[in-house]
Amino acid sequence: MSTVTLSSGYEMPVIGLGLWRLEKDELKEVILNAIKIGYRHFDCAAHYKSEADVGEALAEAFKTGLVKREELFITTKIWNSDHGHVVEACKNSLEKLQIDYLDLYLVHYPMPTKHNAIGKTASLLGEDKVLDIDVTISLQQTWEGMEKTVSLGLVRSIGLSNYELFLTRDCLAYSKIKPAVSQFETHPYFQRDSLVKFCMKHGVLPTAHTPLGGAAANKDMFGSVSPLDDPVLNDVAKKYGKSVAQICLRWGIQRKTAVIPKSSKIQRLKENLEVLEFQLSDEDMQLIYSIDRKYRTSLPSKTWGLDVYA
């Protein structure tokens, strides 16, 4: 598995398996199969409500000798409602995952909300049916909590998720331990070149969630526009004898982002790893750069009642 060295000094595999919205009854089998075919990076979150199930799969993998803990890279994320309780939330995730440390801990959204209980990950709405944001906690305070998880030995690397450029800049300014990773939506239809280049310039690894666009997974949630249907990408895929999804992932890796695709199907899991076995030409990379639509598919405003990217 190809890796990249983070600013923290640790190695992170450039392809991870995203575990969002995987069904609980299939999660264990998916993780074990993924490990068997070569996956070493798993992307979790408290909000996915599956950390305990992931923990059971990891425990079995370790017990049976399928893989050693030090061979895996485990990421999880703190939810909005726990910004004021970072260390406690981290320990809660570790307990569920049945591991002693996290390889990477991310702030899921730059948006503290009303706390209810550690690890419960509620998104409480106010009387106006709008997400109840906690204005008493600053993102700097949240980051200080993240830094404490490192000093306590709970976490090796810390980072951001769904942060825009200027919030990333602010974190770089006030942090004592710099964010090693910034995970955000990016794919051929939403390339975010300025954010990608800014992160790379300042030693933050850009990591693509939703690297295929979201329509293939859930059209009701993400809309029907998908780069997988794009004629340019389909032509490139035919040229290389690959799937459009493989072209999207390979493009992401060649622009020096890590990618976190999601799948539960063993054949697609294998195909996703195969993107490490070929390269796109410079001409085809530029061709894909030309199809950017600035089309964001991940829109929490649909359930939270406000545009969190405003």
UniProtKB/Swiss-Prot annotation:
Disulphide bridges: none
Signal peptide feature range: none
EC number of the protein: 1.1.1.200
InterPro entries for the chain: AKR, AKR2A1, Aldo/ket_reductase_CS, NADP_OxRdtase_dom, NADP_OxRdtase_dom_sf
Residues at which NADP(+) binds: 210-272
Enzymatic class: oxidoreductase
Site feature (Lowers pKa of active site Tyr) residues: 77
Protein residues bound to substrate: 108
Keywords: NADP, Oxidoreductase
Reaction(s) catalysed (UniProt annotation): D-sorbitol 6-phosphate + NADP(+) = aldehydo-D-glucose 6-phosphate + NADPH + H(+)
Any one GO molecular function term: aldo-keto reductase (NADPH) activity
Active-site residue numbers: 48
Protein family according to the UniProt entry: Belongs to the aldo/keto reductase family.
Task performed by this protein: Synthesizes sorbitol-6-phosphate, a key intermediate in the synthesis of sorbitol which is a major photosynthetic product in many members of the Rosaceae family.
Name the UniProt record assigns to this protein: NADP-dependent D-sorbitol-6-phosphate dehydrogenase
Source organism (scientific name): Malus domestica
